Amino acid sequence: YTLPHRIRDGYGLSEKLIRDAYEQGCDTILTCDNGIAAAAEIDLAKQLGMTVIVTDHHEVPLHWEGDTSTAVLPAADAVVDPKRTDCAYPCKGICGAVVAWKVLWLVQRICGQPDAWKKYLAFAAFATIGDVMELRGENRTITALGLQQLRQTDNVGLQALTAASGIEPDQIRAYHIGYVIGPCINATGRLDTAKRALELLTETDTMRAQQIAQELVSL
C-alpha cells in the first residue's frame, strides 16, 4: 500500500504515485477516499496497462455546457461512489472509509466469509465520526454498533491510544473519537504522512504500540 505524503504527493492520486507503483511491478490500483476527480492520473494508469478501482465518496466532477451539466467519471475499471448520479444506494453520506469497507464486505462474502465485515466495524465507526459525517440513518447505525465494538476492541493500537489519551475503554463515546482520539490519528497526516497512524493500528506488540500512541498524543 501507499499513503500519499502531503508535501510531496498532495492529496489523492498523482502521476508520481502511479509511476512508482508501475515501476514496483504493481498491476492494480485500488483507491480509498479519493480518485473520483483524478481522471488524468487514471488515464495514465490505464495507458500503462494497469487495472484501476476507485472507491470514493466525494462529489463527481461536472462538465458544463451552458446550463447543462454532465457527470465526468474517470476511466477506471470500476468506480464505486454513492455520489454517482446513476447510483441508487440510499445513504449518500457515508465516508470514504465506509465505501471501501463495503467493497471489502462484498469481496469477503463472495469468498465465503459473510461475517468477516464485523472485524472492521469499529474502524468504520471511527472513520464516520472522524470525517464528520452526519450521524443519521446508516451512519448512526454504524456508529452505534461500532462504538460498542470499540469499547471491547482487541486491536492493540487502539487500546494503546485510548489508554494514552486517558480514556477508560468502556467510556468511549463519539465525542472522544471526534475531539480526543481522532485528532491524534489525523495529526501525522496533517503534518506529512499518515504512515505513523497506520503503523499504530496494525501494530501487534503492546510496548511498541504504547510508544507510538504516546508520540501521537504528544503531537
Regions found by a protein language model. Give the residues of each.
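Short, glycine/acidic-enriched loop or turn micro-motifs at the edges of active sites
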Residues: 36, 59-60, 84, 134, ...
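Amphipathic alpha-helical transducer elements in NTP-driven molecular machines
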Residues: 39, 94-97, 101, 140-144, ...
